[in-house]
Amino acid sequence: SGVENARDIGGYRTMDDHHVKKRVLLRSGKLDKATENDKKKLLEVYHLQEVIDLRTTAERSQAMDPVLPGVNAVWLKILNENVKSSSNNMIANMFQKPAASIPESTHPAYGIVQAIKAGAYSPAMYTPIVSSDYSRKQYHAFFMELLKSRDGALLWQCTGGKDRTGVAAVLTLAALGVDKETIIKDYLLTNDFSAQTIAYISSEAAKLTQDQAILRTVPKLVGVDREIIDRFYDAIEKQYGSMDGFLKSGIGLTKQDITQLRAMYLE
């Protein structure tokens, strides 16, 4: 129980020798199991003012966020729900609850194993975000929320707090001027923060299948994998020349937006 994979992205040093402010930019997985203590911490320690939910309609209905007093809730679906077959939906599909009519569907690793069998894991799973007008517009809207002034913290979340949320963190840290290796290290921290879940689902998956290729893929899908983020950067560099080019031409941030973000979130 509790909030999975929650962390503050503050404290990182930028290439021009500033630091990302602490306690203002938070990332996490779904909040439906947040304990009273979690909620208290978010409100009293972080002075949480806004939650941006990046999930699909189905994910939200299966795990509703708690209502937090005085906290503005914003919903930005990163994945286009109208594109049923696209690899875009792979990320969301593995979190959908399977039909109750399948007896073994209650097994904790069932959804992940089925998702892998259906081809949900690909090292290129984030690259559709780079080429999707829809997803880029949603991330633009995400940055517009970041640019609104507030006195407390802003938190963004999806289901696992690693893919859509991870991409949002990568783009945010890049816009703030943090170097690529540091950004990737932060992205990979999911494997530490979710270590228990990864170990549990991996051992449960071994009860469902003996297929070694599937079992090797489970931790990459429950956690994160370096190759996925490398491919994401490769796609950005191929299509936009650089991360800076992607933030400006792909996401639509102006020079002024980036200057303002840095003024707000660096010290």
Pin down the residues of each PLM region.
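Ser/Thr-glycine-rich phosphate-binding loops at phosphate-binding pockets of nucleotides
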Residues: 159-160, 164-165
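Cys-dependent protein tyrosine phosphatase-like superfamily
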Residues: 1-155, 167-267
